[in-house]
């Protein structure tokens, strides 16, 4: 996990736990699937990424990028902007990881299967 903004409230261990739980909820084993990274960034960085990869010139709270290295070692990266977050950073880690695990949602996120999956993962991982 890389915290470029000094958020300091999400440890690498917790990020790993959340990503692994999201993958398990979809019947996947992160240890077998590969590595996923979580990066916390400033609004300008996420706006630039959102424009570059999605053609949307605005800030967003989370982006997920699927990757596959030559040996399948890298599942992808979840990029989060805490300053833009409409939900908690931990929720966004799970949200991004569910995207990496193959889930998607419509514009009406709160009515989606992905929302229910995210809520279930968060309930199971709350300390």
What name fits each language-model region?
Residues 1-93, 97-127:
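An acidic/histidine-cluster motif and surrounding catalytic segment
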């Amino acid at each position: 996990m890389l915290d470029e903004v000094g958020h300091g409230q999400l440890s690498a261990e917790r990020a790993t736990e959340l990503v692994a739980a999201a993958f398990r909820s979809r019947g996947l084993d992160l240890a077998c699937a590969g590595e996923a990274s979580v990066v916390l960034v400033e609004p300008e960085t996420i706006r630039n990424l959102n424009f570059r990869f999605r053609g949307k010139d605005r800030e967003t709270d989370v982006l997920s990028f699927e990757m596959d290295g030559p040996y399948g070692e890298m599942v992808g990266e979840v990029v989060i902007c805490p300053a833009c977050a409409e939900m908690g950073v931990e929720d966004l880690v799970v949200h991004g990881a569910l995207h990496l695990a193959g889930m998607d949602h419509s514009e009406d996120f709160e009515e989606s299967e992905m929302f229910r999956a995210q809520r279930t993962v968060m309930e199971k991982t709350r300390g």
